Regions:
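Short acidic capping loops at alpha-helix termini that bridge into adjacent secondary structure
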Residues: 50-54, 75-77, 121, 159, ...
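PLP-dependent aminotransferase-like
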Residues: 70-127
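Active-site phosphate-binding strand-loop segment of PLP-dependent enzymes
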Residues: 106-163
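PLP-dependent aminotransferase class I/II
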Residues: 178-256, 260-263
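Conserved PLP-binding catalytic core of the aspartate aminotransferase-like
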Residues: 244-245, 256-288, 309
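PLP-dependent enzyme catalytic core of the Aspartate aminotransferase-like
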Residues: 284-288, 297-333
Length: 333
């Protein structure tokens, strides 16, 4: 088997039919500026909302960037449970905003701490659920509490990994006027290379986000592939998610048996505390063709590794074998 890239939380392979969609693209599409409205209408229908409540973006990153540009400036702040997706802080600071970190590790969602942190200068409150890199989730009650505490500030609900979780907060979020939902086709839908994300919010919020970034954010072939991906249905997505959930449980069991400490996760990855064995384990895995993610310099994560789940039997067996061999080769000292 060739190397396993288990450091980027990739989804499963999209269906073969998408290659037919690529072959059938109209060359005229390539010389015209792209139109995202057809994809926005399809996404709106999926969630039972008007198209004016949907904005297609260049992946989730573009969506987060637009929210920060629209809501933050010098003197305004983002309340951010940490550890979190690194681009949150990056885009907040690019927009001139400050970041107010709220620790969220193995315990429940830090709703009370967020309530205390929100103030007149708060522009954005972030809820990443499932959280990256921990895999922890917030509940509907948590989201409602954040929305109430945020007042006029925007609540950014990052749902990039929600297909892998037991619960989906999108429907509840759509009933809360200050919540903006970020979702993507990059993870469970397998289109990371196309850079297709989207935002759900009120018409006023969506209009502001549309104006906060460049026009034509998503290339025409990516829009076409997004439409084809959704038209192909969800059966393969559900099958992929089922495999990943089974792998997640099995990986946590194996890591525990090996004397490591996996964090509970509802995403397509597991964060594992390795203690003094972290460096040796990462080196051992790399030597066996398995790349995982380390977090040097990230407070509280210095000796943790994040392992993506491949969603494929042969690849998962290779991962387990590499773990056993790496620890047996000296990482367990």
């Amino acid at each position: 088997m060739t190397g396993l890239a288990l450091d980027a939380n990739l989804g499963g392979l999209p269906p073969q039919a998408l290659l037919d969609a690529v072959a059938g693209l109209d060359p005229e599409m390539l010389r015209r500026y792209p139109e995202t409205a057809p994809l926005e209408r399809v996404l709106a229908a999926r969630f039972g909302v008007d198209a004016e409540r949907v904005l297609v973006t260049a992946g989730g990153d573009d969506a987060i960037d637009r929210i920060c540009r629209a809501r933050l400036r010098p003197g305004r702040s983002m309340v951010l449970p940490v550890p979190s997706f690194e681009m949150m802080e990056h885009f907040a600071r690019l927009a001139g905003g400050a970041v107010v970190p709220i620790p969220w590790t193995r315990g429940p969602f830090p709703l009370d701490a967020i309530r205390r942190a929100v103030g007149p200068d708060t522009g954005v409150v972030v809820v990443v659920s499932p959280n990256n890199p921990t895999g922890a989730v917030a509940t509907a009650a948590d989201l409602e509490g954040v929305a109430e505490a945020a007042g006029p500030a925007a609540v950014l609900l990052d749902h990039a990994y929600v297909e892998y979780a037991a619960g989906d907060l999108t429907a509840r979020a759509l009933a809360l006027p200050n919540v903006i939902v970020v979702r993507t086709l990059s993870k469970a839908w397998g289109l990371a290379g196309c850079r297709v994300g989207y935002v759900l919010g009120t018409p006023t919020a969506i209009d502001a986000l549309r104006r906060a970034g460049a026009p034509y954010p998503v290339a025409a072939p990516s829009v076409a592939l997004g439409l084809a991906r959704l038209a192909a249905g969800e059966r393969d997505v559900r099958d992929h998610v089922t495999r990943v959930r089974a792998e997640r449980a099995a990986l946590c069991q194996r890591l525990t048996a090996l004397g490591l400490e996996p964090w509970p996760s509802e995403a397509n990855f597991v964060l594992v505390e390795c203690g003094p064995r972290a460096r040796a384990l990462m080196t051992g895995l790399a030597g066996r063709g398995v790349r995982v993610r380390a977090f040097p310099g990230r407070a509280g994560l210095e000796t943790a590794l994040r392992i993506s789940l491949p969603g494929a039997a042969a690849a998962f067996a290779h991962l387990l074998g590499a773990l056993d061999a790496s620890l047996g080769a000296g990482a367990a000292s």
